[in-house]
Amino acid sequence: MVSLISAHLLSLPSSAPRSRPQSRPPLSPPAAAAAASCSFDLPRPRRLVADGSRRKGTMAAAIPPEASGLAHDLGSAAVTAGVALALLRFFEELAKRGVFEQKLNRKLVHITIGMVFLLFWPLFSSGSYAPFLAAVAPGINIIRMLLLGLGVMKNEAMVKSMSRSGDPRELLKGPLYYATTITFATSIFWRTSPIAIALICNLCAGDGIADIVGRRLGQEKLPYNPNKSYAGSIAMALAGFMASIGYMHYFQSFGFIEESWSLAFGFLVVSVTAALVESHPISTHLDDNLTVPLTSFLVGSLVF
């Protein structure tokens, strides 16, 4: 039995020994370069922060510069109008409480509104629409003067702070000319023109200081106009000139204009001429808020 089993096992075919995997021959340089070109790396997971910043950059690039400048100027116009409104409300409250006499309060409004308004011009961009958006604040005052002067809107405190007699119809003259002048200077000439500086500084600082000084130190009257004094006219010329020089330097620091001695001399000529016209009786019959800016515009067009 055992011999039969042994004979059967010997008759079975022996299994071939397992061959070890033979190492491949090294590739030639051209074949290696081709194999490397076919290989690829799996993409690494990107961080969410990097992806978010890329998305923000894409969105910012999609917004045209004109749109971003317009949004900036709209915000600047809102800030400027808000400050102007706050100043008017402040002087209205002073008029209600009787902190200053009515004439002095009116002249403080006259000086402050225009001078502070100029400070906000550098907030706006260099876009072509910027001066018109900047003119929104004084433009709103034009509408308010019309509504108050025509009796459509009532505001006794504002009328008291901006008129001589408290009559609302008075706002249709001097205060309306005042707001129109600032709107015109802003939208037409803007911050690169010395004419705009001369217009607003002589109207606001010059004319305002002339009345304050003239009422307190104006004993010596002018020979051609007993309602005006030497002190008031000299104060107007100096105040308008100094304010113009100050804003020339202010706008030069932002690169809007280039200050020079010739420009300073031009401001002096405009301020002296405006003071002479303001002292003439014709300014009393018309309105110095009309004659002073007209003079500043005409003379400024010649000297600048």
From Swiss-Prot:
It is a multi-pass membrane protein. Its EC number is 2.7.1.182. This is Probable phytol kinase 2, chloroplastic. GO terms for molecular function: kinase activity; phytol kinase activity. Involved in the activation and reutilization of phytol from chlorophyll degradation in plant metabolism, including tocopherol biosynthesis. Catalyzes the conversion of phytol to phytol monophosphate (PMP). It comes from the Eukaryota. Belongs to the polyprenol kinase family.
